[in-house]
Every structure is written in structure tokens, then in C-alpha cells.
Amino acid sequence: MAQKQIKVTLVRSVIGTKQSHRDTVRGLGLRGLNSSRVLIDTPEVRGMLRKVDYLVTVSEA
């Protein structure tokens, strides 16, 4: 069975955010504003998304 995937898009700038939140965004593979990545839906990724939920949008890939 194929693993579930999610699409993550950075919709707010990381300027003025905590360094740990900036590091989390980079860890998700997001660089500039409106950049997107398709990631495998794992508990680790979900935890990272929960930490920066005010900066990103999540949709099914």
C-alpha cells in the first residue's frame, strides 16, 4: 500500500519568528514564500507542521 502524502506550502514569511521555527521550516524543505513540498505523512512531519501551523498550509497531495 502506498504511503499517504501531504502537500505543504509556506504562506507566511519566517521574518520575525523564533529561530527554532525557522529551523523547522527549513527542515520541512521549504525555502522562500509560496514554496511547496510533497512529504510523506508521518508523525514526525505532523509534529513539525503543528509547530509552525501559523506559517504553512497543508493539503492532500
UniProtKB/Swiss-Prot annotation:
GO molecular function, one term: structural constituent of ribosome
Subunit structure: Part of the 50S ribosomal subunit.
Cell inner membrane keyword on record: no
NCBIfam families for this protein: rpmD_bact (TIGR01308)
Protein name: Large ribosomal subunit protein uL30
CDD domains per UniProt: Ribosomal_L30
Family, similarity comment: Belongs to the universal ribosomal protein uL30 family.
Biological processes per GO annotation: translation
PANTHER family (alphabetical): LARGE RIBOSOMAL SUBUNIT PROTEIN UL30M (PTHR15892:SF2), MITOCHONDRIAL RIBOSOMAL PROTEIN L30 (PTHR15892)
Keyword Ribonucleoprotein belongs to the record: yes
Keywords: Ribonucleoprotein, Ribosomal protein
Any one Pfam family match given in the protein's UniProt record, by short name: Ribosomal_L30
Native source organism of the sequence: Bordetella avium (strain 197N)
GO annotation, cellular component aspect: cytosolic large ribosomal subunit
